[in-house]
């Protein structure tokens, strides 16, 4: 089980990313637009730098919904490989079965 502080930190980052998503996209659009002037671009870069660091989506970490484990998380299920295996062995995931060849 992951530390509760680490899970809470990721939840906080997700909330910040949602809050500043529109503003970040607007500034990024100005920066990448070839028609905008150099002054406008530079102003947008400076504004983007003033936003909270944790509002960037790339700072979020995929975590297991049950345990908070940060590694080996399968996106399709939102669970770590260990919990997916346990659920599959109990038959809780429809259509998923252990491979054999």
Curated annotation (Swiss-Prot):
GO biological process, one term: translation
InterPro entries: Ribosomal_uS14, Ribosomal_uS14_bac/plastid, Ribosomal_uS14_CS
Pfam families xrefs: Ribosomal_S14 (PF00253)
Entry keyword annotation includes Ribosomal protein: yes
Single GO MF descriptor: rRNA binding
GO CC field: cytoplasm; small ribosomal subunit
Entry keyword set: Ribonucleoprotein, Ribosomal protein, RNA-binding, rRNA-binding
NCBIfam families linked to this entry: PRK08881.1 (NF006477)
Role of this protein: Binds 16S rRNA, required for the assembly of 30S particles and may also be responsible for determining the conformation of the 16S rRNA at the A site.
Family: Belongs to the universal ribosomal protein uS14 family.
Subunit structure: Part of the 30S ribosomal subunit. Contacts proteins S3 and S10.
HAMAP family recorded: Ribosomal_uS14_1 (MF_00537)
Protein name per Swiss-Prot or TrEMBL: Small ribosomal subunit protein uS14
Annotated organism of origin: Actinobacillus pleuropneumoniae serotype 5b (strain L20)
Organism taxonomic ancestry: Bacteria, Pseudomonadati, Pseudomonadota, Gammaproteobacteria, Pasteurellales
């Amino acid at each position: 089980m992951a530390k509760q502080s680490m899970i809470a930190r990721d939840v906080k980052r997700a909330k910040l990313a949602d809050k500043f998503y529109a503003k970040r996209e607007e500034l990024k659009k100005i920066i990448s637009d070839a028609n905008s002037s150099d002054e406008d671009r530079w102003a947008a870069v400076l504004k983007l730098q003033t936003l909270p660091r944790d509002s960037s989506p790339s700072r979020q970490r995929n975590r297991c919904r049950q345990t908070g484990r940060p590694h080996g998380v399968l996106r399709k299920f939102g669970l770590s490989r260990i919990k997916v295996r346990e659920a599959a062995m109990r038959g809780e995931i429809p259509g998923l079965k252990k491979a054999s060849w």
